[in-house]
Amino acid sequence: MKWVIIKGVRYPSSVISAFAAYNMDNPFLKVRIRNKYHIVSFDDVNKMASQMVYLMNNYPDFVEIGRWWISKKTVMSWVPKGKAVDGSGWVISFTRSFGLEGGTQIRFDKEDEYLSEIDRLNELFNVIL
């Protein structure tokens, strides 16, 4: 069994299904462990960044959606929605086997970023066009 270490605590790698970094005055990670969200605080942004790099290296099958890194297995579907109804940008909507803070959509200010993300997701999920 493979284990990972999050700020000194060891967890079986199979119990972690998502994680995200929050860079504020008090940096922290939000980690989904055994279907519950845990907040792991850090003294400074550099320590948190090191932990994020460690997690990203140990979960190569996770994909970045918005600020979250989640297991590809939990993504049930995703749909490019195009221009947002309010005209605020371009939207990609996701259906996952669990909810994440921040909703189920990611927005892009520029159309080229939106199209680039669609291409990236098509490649990540081996979409047959």
Per-region residue spans from a language model:
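Acidic, Ser/Thr- and proline-rich intrinsically disordered linker/docking segments
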Residues: V9, V15-W69, T74-L129
